[in-house]
Every structure is written in structure tokens, then in C-alpha cells.
């Protein structure tokens, strides 16, 4: 499912064995294997979660809708087509909160991650009420079943209320900027 595989090494590892493992993972498993030092958080999480948290924080500051934020901070920034908020829903809002807490605890107070790893009240409210993403009642997006219809709804970051989701593309976001 995921293309990236991180092999964590330390000073006690035999580098020949590490390199053999890397080659096996690339050739036999088809993974993009990288060798990392043992530090808090996987490399993918250090980069990806940081970028997602910055995007989320900026969306709140800029008073964007989640649809606008996902169009702007999604594909154009290398995030999957779900966009940032959709990706939070896919991963699990509660799991992302746990990852953030882990980083806050394990990383130095001077680490740049600490600046953006603050708890967001709406995120806490979503988790507390069972809106943990796709595995729960919904998250930033939810599917509202009305009779035979399924209506995709998006949460308003300011009010916490849901309304019918407006789909934006990065082209549409560019147009709105003009």
C-alpha cells in the first residue's frame, strides 16, 4: 500500500546486513527503501505530518473552507488527491492527534515541529464526539445519508457545522485568488 519503507539503523548494526535488507526490500518487495537514524518519528511522519499540520494551521488562520484548503494544499503541494483534511480523515483524526502528542513529548522544545503541533480545539471536539474520520461517524468530511441519497458534507472550520461539500480544484482555487 505504501511505497516508502524506512529501515532504522544505529551504531550497533552491521551495515552490510542493513544494505542487504535494503536491497531485498527494493527488489523483492518493490519498496522505496531508505536507511534512517533512530530519531523520534519516522522520516515520512516528520516531513508529512509537519506539512499537513502547517497546512491545517494555515487553513484556520486564513479562514479557508476545507474544500479550498484541500484544493490549495492538496495536489499542488504533493499531498494525495484526498487533500490535507481528507487525508486526516483517512488516517484517523484521533491517530493523527496521538502522533502529534508523541512528537510534542519526544522532540526538543526548539524543534520547529513544536510551533505547529498545538492542539486545535475543533480537532479535539471532533475526537471527543466520535468524529474520528472515515472509521468513525465522519471527520472533516462526512457522508450524510438522506433516504436513498448519500450527500458529502464538509465541516466549517469556524462554526463546526456541516454543509454540502463544494468541490474545488486547484484551477478553481487559482481563479478565486484573481
Residues of each region from the PLM?
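Rossmann-fold dinucleotide-binding core
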Residues: 1-46, 81, 165
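A general alpha-helix detector
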Residues: 3-4, 51-55, 99-102, 122, ...
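Short, polar/flexible loop-turn hinges at active-site or ligand-entry regions and domain interfaces
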Residues: 9-13, 59-62, 110-111
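A short alpha-helix-loop-beta-strand transition element characteristic
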Residues: 16-17, 65-68, 134-135
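Rossmann-like dinucleotide-binding core of oxidoreductases
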Residues: 46, 51-71
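Interdomain hinge/lid region at the active-site interface
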Residues: 71, 75-150
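Glycine-rich phosphate/pyrophosphate-binding loop
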Residues: 146-170
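Single conserved hydrophobic/aromatic residue that forms the stacking wall/gate
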Residues: 168-178
